[in-house]
Amino acid sequence: MTLIGIGNVLQKDDGLGVYAASYLNDNYTFSEKIEIINGGVEGIHLLNVLEESDHVVVLDCLQLDDTPASIYAIPAKEISGYGLNNGGAHEIGILQCMDMMELQGKEVPEAIVIGIVPAEVTFTFGLSDEIVDAFEGYISVVLQYLSKHGINHQKVANTTTLLELINRAKDPSGVMVS
C-alpha cells in the first residue's frame, strides 16, 4: 500500500495532505510494508509510483461545497476525471494520472481519496484553525482505513507535533518526509 500526501504547503490548507503524510511517517510504525510519499504538487511525476502500486491512499484537501474541515473518504473511481490539485493546463493531478493509465490500458491501482474540505487556500504557510482542530480526527480516519485493510499501527515514543511539521516546511532545508 502507498500513502501519497498531495498539496502545496505554500497555500495554507492545500498543504494538508503533505502535513498528514509527514505526521504519519514521523509518529507511527505500521505492521505491514507501507510506503509514505510526499507527493506535493508533483502530478505527472507520480505516474511511476501509481504504476508500481496496487493500493493507493491519497491524502489531500477537497474543494467541495461543504463546511470547512468536513472529512471524506471517496473511492477514486467516483471522482475520476476531476483530478486533485489541478493547477491548470501545465499541471496534471494524481487522479488524471490514473485516467491516463486507464486510457493506456495499464492496470490502475485500487485508490481512495481521504480528504478534508479546506477553510483557507491562500499564499501562506500553516493550516487554518478549522483544519488544525480537525487534524487529529482526520489522522484517525486514515488510521481506521489502514486498520480495515489489515495494516495496524503503533504510535512511536518520540512524536512530532503538527506545529513542528509546519515549522519544518518553512525551513528550505527541512525534510517533510524522509
Where are these regions (language model features)?
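Phosphate/ribose-phosphate-bearing ligand recognition and processing surfaces
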Residues: 83-87, 94, 101-178
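Predominant activation on well-ordered alpha-helical scaffold segments within soluble catalytic domains
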Residues: 18-22, 47, 95-98, 139, ...
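Residue-level recognition of the N-termini of beta-strands and the immediately preceding loop/turn
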Residues: 1, 34, 109-112
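Conserved active-site and cofactor/substrate-binding residues in soluble primary-metabolism enzymes
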Residues: 15, 19, 41, 66, ...
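Generic secondary-structure boundary/loop-capping signal
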Residues: 41, 68-71, 89, 118-120, ...
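Residue-identity detector for threonine
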Residues: 2, 29, 67, 122-124, ...
